[in-house]
């Protein structure tokens, strides 16, 4: 029996924990649920990124000549929403999405396929030297070794013309006007989350050595774009306000998903006595427009050289 009195599930079946459904494939390695609220959160974040990037689906180049058939790989595709949009945009492309869990829709464009369950930290059998674009978004918290993952991506891109595009949110709270106190629940929450996921060998903290790691893997033409994302609608700038509206929705809807497993599995904290009050304290601060705090999106693009 599990801790909440349910039968122990089969190895690859979904199971209930703290009121949320988690997938059984590579059981326990991945900290985040696979239920309907989590699918909604992923799709909210897709819209959030679209707003933050002013509608831009990708930054790295994709061959658009009619006689070419670009190959696009989405690693950790989630609900598949980005892959679907790319397949719709590039009708002559071959698009493939990989994920640990089967939460993608059945009705998809004819030039799109999904391979699930697939753990992208396991060996790949996807065709080396054959992809034009490999896309990775919001992977912090599910990667044990960035050097190994970047090396896999490098070897699977076409020499000379293949690009990686990697998008992450640095979730460490930032504030330039001291309206976020040093002892805020938001800062404490992030500290606990960063520590717990580090102990689980899949840190949610943003990897600040990304440029060096991409260089070490062999990439060239490395470019970084940083977009500030406020926690709510506190900025005066209309675009920043719109970003904050979507980011607040994604964060507040996903607080339980981000918090429950790390703090109960790693720290063994009681869900109702300890973890839920933390979540509610963080939620209040995220929605407080008097707190002028933000995170940063980091968008990395890089090319595999010919030699």
UniProtKB/Swiss-Prot annotation:
Question: Which EC number(s) are documented for this chain?
Answer: 2.1.1.-
Q: Which UniProt keywords apply?
A: Methyltransferase, Nucleus, S-adenosyl-L-methionine, Sporulation, Transcription, Transcription regulation, Transferase, Virulence
Task: Write out the GO cellular component annotations.
Answer: nucleus
> Which Gene3D superfamilies does the annotation name?
Vaccinia Virus protein VP39 (3.40.50.150)
UniProt enzyme class: transferase
Q: Which GO terms describe its biological process?
A: methylation; sporulation resulting in formation of a cellular spore
Please give the subunit comment from the record.
Component of the heterotrimeric velvet complex composed of LAE1, VEL1 and VEL2; VEL1 acting as a bridging protein between LAE1 and VEL2.
List, alphabetically, the PANTHER family matched.
METHYLTRANSFERASE, PROTEIN-METHIONINE METHYLTRANSFERASE LAEA
Supply the name of the protein.
Secondary metabolism regulator LAE1
Species of origin: Cochliobolus heterostrophus (strain C5 / ATCC 48332 / race O)
Q: Which gene encodes it?
A: LAE1
């Amino acid at each position: 029996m599990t801790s909440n009195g349910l039968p122990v599930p089969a190895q690859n079946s979904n199971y209930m924990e703290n009121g949320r459904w988690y997938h059984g494939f590579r059981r326990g390695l991945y900290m985040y649920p696979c239920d309907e609220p989590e699918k909604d959160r992923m799709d909210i974040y897709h819209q959030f990124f679209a707003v933050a990037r002013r509608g831009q689906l990708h930054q790295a180049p994709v061959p658009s000549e009619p006689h070419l058939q670009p190959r696009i790989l989405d690693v950790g595709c989630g609900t598949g929403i980005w892959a679907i949009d790319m397949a719709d945009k590039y009708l002559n492309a071959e698009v493939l999405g990989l994920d640990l869990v089967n939460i993608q829709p059945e009705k998809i464009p004819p030039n799109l396929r999904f391979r699930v369950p697939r753990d992208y930290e396991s060996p790949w059998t996807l065709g080396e030297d054959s992809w034009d674009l490999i896309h990775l978004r919001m992977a912090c918290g599910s990667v044990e070794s960035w050097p190994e993952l970047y090396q896999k991506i490098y070897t699977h891109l076409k020499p000379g013309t293949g690009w990686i595009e990697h998008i992450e949110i640095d979730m460490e709270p930032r504030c330039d006007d001291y309206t976020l106190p040093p002892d805020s629940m938001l800062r404490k929450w992030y500290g606990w989350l960063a520590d717990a996921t580090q102990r689980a060998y899949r840190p949610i903290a943003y990897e600040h050595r990304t440029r060096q790691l991409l260089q070490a893997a062999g990439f060239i033409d490395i470019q970084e774009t940083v977009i500030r994302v406020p926690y709510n609608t506190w900025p005066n700038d209309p675009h920043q306000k719109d970003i904050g509206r979507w980011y607040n929705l994604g964060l507040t809807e996903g607080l339980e998903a981000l918090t429950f497993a790390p703090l109960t599995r790693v720290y063994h904290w009681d869900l109702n006595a300890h973890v839920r009050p933390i979540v509610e304290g963080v939620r209040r601060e995220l929605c407080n427009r008097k707190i002028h705090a933000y995170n940063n999106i980091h968008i990395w693009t890089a090319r595999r050289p010919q030699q």
